[in-house]
């Protein structure tokens, strides 16, 4: 697993949130804290025990359940955290753990006592898989993404006695509600995530090793980095290339379309300074949306430069006779100068002497259209005689 460093380099690092969850669950198991985190509805009447609605996901009382939860975190949780970012992954995990716990307590209050009374992280795994698997995306391979949580729901009771089946089902239902947008009003805004990531703590964790906070896709930390012409790497990588891992293991889509393959601008007249942005390369770990957005932007710029319509010839300039003094214009006309050229010369100098100097020197052309009023060239007199 690779994470992007503070200057864009890649270094081997593990996703922070899912790795810390593994350490925390293992530590709680070793110290025997699992029974103290059981989701017991009768204990929730005590205000100091309400934390069980959330912390029940961290405790385990059976070793097979702990091993299954730990196995799914590196195989599924790491990919989810890379796709969502550390902050959004933590928010989604906590939200789904709370939702599944509330649903289990509700079912227990309705008489289904087996829906609660246990603990474990498997309901959160099922909720995260269900929430991601039901998003609109083309399935890849023989196993559709939406089928994975249902298969896991059927296999988990065969591998471990905790949590009970109804509690697992509550996690799956919470994930389906999450995918349907039931918790959208609880989602943090992009601005809020950006403010958090720019804080001192998040910036410090983003540069740590071997555990690293991953930036949320769409934030400034995910934008491509350009270098000035003098300090760019000598051999920049091809632009717009998304990570093969994200294509194959998480996006569950077909091979990238031809439009996402590396394209180099080839139009004429482009200088090195004008193409500094073209040297930005996407490193492994870049999400698909970033490569797609950058590719669409580059192709739009290239198409506008290559296939843009030819500029229409500029229309001839026009000048109104009312913009100059009629008395001075009459003086020039009595001297024998054409009216159109006299108007232009007077407009340029404002004085008869200066206008005569321009006209005698032949410095006034015949391209300007002169109008009688303040309108456009529709009332033009046309150029005067040579």
From Swiss-Prot:
Matches recorded under InterPro entries: Peptidase_S54_rhomboid_dom, Rhomboid-like_sf, UBA, UBA-like_sf
GO terms under cellular component: membrane
Domain UBA: 324-362
Pfam families: Rhomboid, UBA
Chief location of this protein within or outside the cell: membrane
Transmembrane segments: 20-40, 58-78, 92-112, 141-161, 163-183
Localization in the cell: Membrane
Gene3D superfamilies: DNA helicase RuvA subunit, C-terminal domain, Rhomboid-like
A GO molecular-function descriptor: serine-type endopeptidase activity
Top-level taxon of the source organism: Eukaryota
Coiled coil: none
UniProt name for this protein: Rhomboid domain-containing protein 3
Gene: RHBDD3
